[in-house]
From Swiss-Prot:
It comes from Rickettsia conorii (strain ATCC VR-613 / Malish 7). A lipid is attached at C18 (S-diacylglycerol cysteine). Keywords: Cell membrane, Coiled coil, Lipoprotein, Membrane, Palmitate, Signal. The keyword Cell membrane applies. Its main location: membrane. This is Uncharacterized lipoprotein RC0563. It is found in: Cell membrane. The keyword Cytoplasm does not apply. A lipid is attached at C18 (N-palmitoyl cysteine).
Length: 216
């Protein structure tokens, strides 16, 4: 019996602590969690913004896609007009700072914190290697063109060569403008022997060489 009384008393005590705002007891926290062990600092929770709208606001600021400020509901005769803090300007500056922080973080993560205009040793080496590769590629293309021209020239030359070396009977020597010179006959005490063996040998050799000559 005593145990039941103690349990009932503790239950009433726990329920009495939630009677002021019973619905908010099981409400989700600012971080959209039923049981939130993080997010609280100094007894207060930081406001949770929707990341989708923050990204959209940054994009609009970067693209300069801003709506005009509407001051229709603002009293122009108010003495505090000059001391009013423009919320649009304040939000714009806030998002600009956020964008700058994002850019600095991305550069730090990518390892390019230095300015793009500064020429580093690694970038210079990459540029030199790229230029060298382009020059080698161009030289290789020129060499291929020269080889193709040489092959074509070789084929053209082979068309004018005769494999069996036949003498062309229609060949005529080129005409020159030189006047013929009449030399005096050579005096020889002994007449030529047309039937000599040496002369016949030279005639046969000339005939063999003439049969192997190429026609023009």
């Amino acid at each position: 019996m005593l145990k039941k009384i103690i349990i009932l008393f503790l239950g009433m005590f726990l329920l009495s602590a939630c009677t002021d705002n019973f619905r908010s007891y099981f409400q989700r926290s600012a971080n959209n969690r039923l049981v939130d062990s993080k997010g609280a600092k100094g007894g207060k929770r930081k406001p949770v913004y929707n990341n989708k709208y923050i990204t959209l606001a940054k994009k609009n600021i970067v693209e300069d896609n801003l709506d005009d400020d509407n001051d229709d509901d603002y009293d122009s005769d108010s003495p505090l007009r000059g001391e009013r803090i423009d919320p649009v300007k304040r939000n714009r500056e806030m998002y600009l700072k956020m964008i700058k922080r994002d850019i600095a973080r991305q550069k730090a993560e990518a390892g390019f914190a230095e300015s793009d205009d500064d020429m580093t040793l690694s970038r210079a080496n990459k540029k030199v290697r790229k230029d060298d590769s382009d020059k080698e590629k161009k030289i290789q293309e020129e060499l291929n063109q020269i080889k193709a021209m040489l092959r074509e020239t070789k084929r053209d030359i082979s068309k004018y060569t005769c494999p069996n070396a036949v003498v062309n009977q229609n060949y005529a020597p080129p005409v020159t403008n030189y006047e013929p010179v009449n030399y005096p006959p050579v005096k020889n005490s002994k007449p030529y022997n047309n039937n000599s063996k040496v002369k016949q040998k030279f005639i046969l050799e000339d005939d063999d060489n003439g049969s192997n000559a190429c026609s023009i």
